[in-house]
């Protein structure tokens, strides 16, 4: 009697399962691409903005404010918007963070700079700008002929930190503050 060896059946492959797996992977990939475009800002993200900064990676709508960087022959360490009516300014700068640095480190460093020369810096108020946690505080500058009020806001996204500062004379500060908040509401990362 001869025993015939029969090879065990291998796993069967279903065309339906393969299609489902490939479709699932394609959907996941599309989700990653969509999230990346949203996170980085896709084409046209700054179409409604009046100010766009490739250097510091943002765009905002700031009607009535002029970007002074385009009018100066020297490179400023910040972007500066000016309101011609009263010379109020918004200064915007960004820095690369060291590994492990976060919002608390940026807040401490910025407040240390602001409080030099005996300037009294107000309490930190937590808020959000463009969907990321931010911190703000106010202080007054008495040097010069006109007392100046300053609102400073810092926030972190990824490995970069932004410092945005409104400076206006005390009499017009509240008016400019409303415009400043409008500008911040339009903040878009590029």
Set out the residue ranges of the language-model regions.
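Conserved polar/disulfide-associated segments of primarily extracytoplasmic proteins
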Residues: 71-163, 167-174
């Amino acid at each position: 009697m001869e025993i015939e060896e029969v090879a065990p059946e291998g796993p069967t492959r279903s065309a339906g399962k393969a299609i489902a797996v490939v479709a699932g992977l394609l959907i996941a990939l599309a989700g990653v691409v969509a999230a990346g475009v949203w996170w980085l800002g896709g084409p046209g993200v700054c179409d409604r903005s009046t100010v766009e900064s490739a250097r510091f990676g943002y765009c905002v709508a700031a009607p009535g404010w002029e970007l002074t960087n385009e009018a100066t022959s020297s490179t400023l360490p910040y972007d500066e918007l000016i309101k011609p009516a009263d010379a109020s300014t918004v200064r915007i700068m960004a820095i690369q963070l060291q590994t492990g640095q976060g919002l608390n480190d940026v807040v401490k460093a910025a407040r240390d700079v602001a409080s030099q020369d005996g300037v009294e810096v107000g309490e930190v108020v937590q808020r959000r700008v463009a969907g990321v946690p931010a911190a703000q505080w106010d202080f007054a500058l008495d040097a010069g002929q006109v007392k100046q009020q300053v609102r400073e806001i810092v926030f972190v996204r990824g490995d970069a930190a932004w410092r945005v500062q409104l400076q206006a004379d005390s009499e017009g500060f509240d008016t400019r503050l409303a415009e400043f908040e409008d500008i911040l509401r339009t903040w878009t990362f590029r």
